[in-house]
């Protein structure tokens, strides 16, 4: 009987050791998996936010869609609203080809003769766009030491959407500074 109790105790210790080792391994796997999912989710979240924000602004439908965005609230929503409200003023300049969207997600002047007249309007729009890209980066989990890298990713993700969703005839500037009509 003594041997049976001793072997049960040894067996119990092995079980606990096995469970502990399994838990350690699962924890390590979970951290890797969570990290990989986090990176994937941040990229997908950024692209989704870009698609939704650009669509909301270009379509100029109800701002009720603001609550439907993947990431919204507070100052981010206010920046999106300002861009939404400013768009009717920008639209004729896009349509005449005086301004265009850049690959990096900003608005630039195509016709230098209009630069002074459009300076403040574009400064306001680009300030809000930069803020949207920063806040989207923070919202997807890159608000720490990776913020500056992720802001660049976000600005180009948004830039792609500004260009892709623009009507035919609007101008876009690529990363090399070349302009093409959509």
Write out the residue ranges for each language-model feature.
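Bacterial signal peptide processing site
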Residues: 30-33
């Amino acid at each position: 009987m003594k041997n049976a109790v001793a072997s049960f105790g040894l067996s119990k210790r092995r079980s606990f050791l096995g469970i502990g080792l399994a838990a350690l391994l699962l924890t390590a796997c979970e951290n890797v998996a969570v990290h990989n999912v986090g990176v994937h989710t941040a990229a997908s979240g950024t692209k989704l936010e870009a698609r939704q924000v650009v669509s909301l602004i270009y379509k100029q439908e109800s701002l009720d869609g603001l609550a439907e965005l993947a990431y919204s609230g507070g100052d981010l929503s206010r920046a999106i609203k300002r861009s939404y409200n400013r768009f009717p003023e920008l639209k004729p300049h896009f349509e005449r080809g005086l301004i265009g969207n850049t690959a990096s997600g900003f608005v630039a002047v195509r016709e230098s003769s209009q630069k002074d007249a459009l300076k403040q309007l574009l400064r306001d729009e680009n300030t809000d766009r930069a803020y949207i890209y920063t806040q989207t980066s923070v919202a997807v989990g890159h608000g720490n030491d990776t913020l500056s890298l992720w802001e660049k990713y976000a600005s180009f993700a948004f830039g792609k959407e500004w260009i892709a969703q623009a009507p035919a005839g609007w101008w876009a500037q690529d990363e090399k500074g070349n302009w093409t009509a959509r």
